Amino acid sequence: MGAATKLAFAVFLISCSSGAILGRSETQECIYYNANWEKDKTNRSGIEPCYGDKDKRRHCFATWKNISGSIEIVKQGCWLDDINCYDRNDCIEKKDSPEVFFCCCEGNMCNERFFYFPEMEVTQPTSNPVTPKPPLFNTLLYSLVPIMGIAVIVLFSFWMYRHHKLAYPPVLVPTQDPGPPPPSPLMGLKPLQLLEIKARGRFGCVWKAQLLNEYVAVKIFPIQDKQSWQNEYEIYSLPGMKHDNILQFIGAEKRGTSIDVDLWLITAFHEKGSLTDFLKANVVSWNELCHIAQTMARGLAYLHEDIPGLKDGHKPAISHRDIKSKNVLLKNNLTACIADFGLALKFEAGKSAGDTHGQVGTRRYMAPEVLEGAINFQRDAFLRIDMYAMGLVLWELASRCTASDGPVDEYMLPFEEEIGQHPSLEDMQEVVVHKKKRPVLRECWQKHSGMAMLCETIEECWDHDAEARLSAGCVEERIIQMQKLTNIITTEDIVTVVTMVTNVDFPPKESSL
C-alpha cells in the first residue's frame, strides 16, 4: 500500500508540473539597459519588445557585477529560448559567487528586479529514525532510477542538440557556388580585420573590413536581433541568389561567447555606399539616372521572380519588405544592387511564408495598405508593397537629375517636405492614406520627354490601388524604352541643327537602320 501511495503522489507531481508549463506567462517586453551604450552606439536604457519564432519561448535577462558591495548593471534585455529560464517568474542568480551574475525569467518586465540567492547544501536531520523500506521497493528503486536518469539525460542531450542546430546552422559559409567565382574557404580560416564603421541601421552597424587583400562589408547584429541575422542568412543561402543586382554574400559567423555574442554577416563592399548617400552628395545625369533605375528594377524583378530548374535548385519568389534608397547600394560604375534582407519573405509552394507581421519596414516607405493594416497576406500583395516603395526611390532619383531645365533641388527624403525627417505612424497615415498625397513631381520635369515618362511610371508604381501598380520587370522595360527614345530624340535634334547649318539633306533616321 505504501508503494502505491508513493506512485500516485509522483503522478500527481508530474501533473502539477505539466499544468504549470501550460500556464506559463508570455514575455512580450523587457527592461533594457546597456552599460556600454556609448561604445556600442545604442540607447542606454528603456523598454525592449521581444521578438522570436512563435514556437519558441522568450525571456528577460539581467547581468550585473558586485564590486565591493556596489551593484553595477552590465546588461538587461530580451533573451532567446533557453530551458534554464523556463517557468521562472523572478530573475534569480543561484550560482555561488560568480564573477558576473546572470539571471533570466519569464513574464513581462520580470527583469526589472533581480536577486542573488546562492543554493545552500541542506543537511538532513538524523534525529528521527529511518523507516526501513521493503526489499522489493529497494530493488525496484535501485533498478529503475538509474535507467530513468540515463533516459532523461539522453532525451535532454538530443533536445539541446536539435535546439542548438536550429538556432545556429553548423556551416554558415556556403561551400557550393552555382558558377564563378569558385567557393571561398570557411571564414574562420581567413583573417578578418574591422577598419571603420560606415553605417548604422535598425538591426546593427556596418563596418568596412579587410579580408586578406580585399575589402568587405561586415554587418554586425547584437544577439537580440538574431532573428533578423538568421533571416538574412537564409535568404542569401537560397538557390539562385547570385545576381549582379543583388549584394554579393560572402559568409556569416557568430563571434564572442556567453552574453557578449555578436552575429556577423559578410558581404561585398561598395565604396560609393547607398543610393541615399550618393544622392546627398551628387546630382545625376539622365543616362546615370536610367542606368541606376534600370539595374535597381532588374534586381527587384529577379528577387520577385519564381525560377524553377536552376543548377543549384528552385529559387522562390522573394518579397524584400524594406525597399528604400538606403538599401540600394551602388557599385563603382553606378550599377545598383539590392541589400538588407532582414525582413524579406520567401514564397515556396505548399509552405507558409513565415513571419508575416503586416506593419514592418520603414514608415516613410510604407504603402497605404501597410499603414492601414489592411494587407492581403498573399505573395502578389507583398510584391506590390515593394513596388510602392520603389516608386518613392525613383522619385528620389528624379529629384536629383539634371535632365530638366529647372533647378535641381537639394536632396530630400520622400515626404520630408510634407512631414519632416522623423514622421510618426500617425503622420504617415494622415498624409498617405487619408489625404492620398505623394511627393511632388515638379512641373519642369514634364518638359523633358524622358523625365515626363519617368513621372508617369512613378505614379503607376505608387498608385493607391495596389493591383494597379506596375511590376518590377515592367519598370525595367519602360526605363530601357525611355532611354532609347530620348537618345533617338537627341540624335534627331543634332541632325536638324547640322542640316540647317550646312544646308545638306540627311536621310531620315529610319532609312539608315
From Swiss-Prot:
One of its GO terms (biological process) is activin receptor signaling pathway. Keywords: ATP-binding, Cell membrane, Disulfide bond, Glycoprotein, Kinase, Magnesium, Manganese, Membrane, Metal-binding, Nucleotide-binding, Receptor, Serine/threonine-protein kinase, Signal, Transferase, Transmembrane, Transmembrane helix. It catalyses: L-threonyl-[receptor-protein] + ATP = O-phospho-L-threonyl-[receptor-protein] + ADP + H(+); L-seryl-[receptor-protein] + ATP = O-phospho-L-seryl-[receptor-protein] + ADP + H(+). Glycans are attached at residues 43, 66. The chain crosses the membrane at residues 140-160. Residues 161-513 are cytoplasmic. Residues 192-485 form the Protein kinase domain. It is an enzyme of class 2 (transferase). It is found in: Cell membrane. Belongs to the protein kinase superfamily. TKL Ser/Thr protein kinase family. TGFB receptor subfamily. This is Activin receptor type-2A. It comes from Gallus gallus. The lineage of its organism: Eukaryota, Metazoa, Chordata, Craniata, Vertebrata.
